[in-house]
Amino acid sequence: MADLANLVEQLSSLTVLEAAELSKLLEEKWGVSAAAPVAVAAAAPAGGGAAAAPVEEKTEFNVILKSSGDKKINVIKEIRTITGLGLKEAKDLVEGAPKTVKEGVNKDEAEKIKKVLEEQGASVGIE
């Protein structure tokens, strides 16, 4: 056990250059690469992402107002209708674009909201 403690002390006292050289020597001696664990770790999320691909079908969407366009007053009116906000709150939302208009809505509702706002000249995105 004292040998291990001594080894830890010696390794702790190495400079960065000495530690890099030690790493190279150990790679050669043991026939391994220090980069291998990184490659394995990078592959794990990719595999997890592939497994999650079927679940990728979103059921809830956020409607984002990117800009109000030329007909800001009409967009404010539609925002009030869609969200139930008061005049000041709807105006602040429109003037503060990009802002989320509605969160967690289904795809059909998100598309309807987008269509209504775009008819008024707004630029809208769905996430």
From Swiss-Prot:
NCBIfam families: L12. HAMAP family: Ribosomal_bL12. Gene3D superfamilies: 3.30.1390.10, Single helix bin. SUPFAM superfamilies: ClpS-like (SSF54736), Ribosomal protein L7/12, oligomerisation (N-terminal) domain (SSF48300). One of its GO terms (biological process) is translation. GO terms for molecular function: mRNA binding; structural constituent of ribosome. Belongs to the bacterial ribosomal protein bL12 family. The keyword Transmembrane helix does not apply. Homodimer. Part of the ribosomal stalk of the 50S ribosomal subunit. Forms a multimeric L10(L12)X complex, where L10 forms an elongated spine to which 2 to 4 L12 dimers bind in a sequential fashion. Binds GTP-bound translation factors. Disulfide bonds: none annotated. It comes from the Bacteria. GO terms for cellular component: cytosolic large ribosomal subunit. InterPro entries: Ribosomal_bL12, Ribosomal_bL12_C, Ribosomal_bL12_C/ClpS-like, Ribosomal_bL12_oligo, Ribosomal_bL12_oligo_N_sf. This is Large ribosomal subunit protein bL12. Pfam families: Ribosomal_L12, Ribosomal_L12_N.
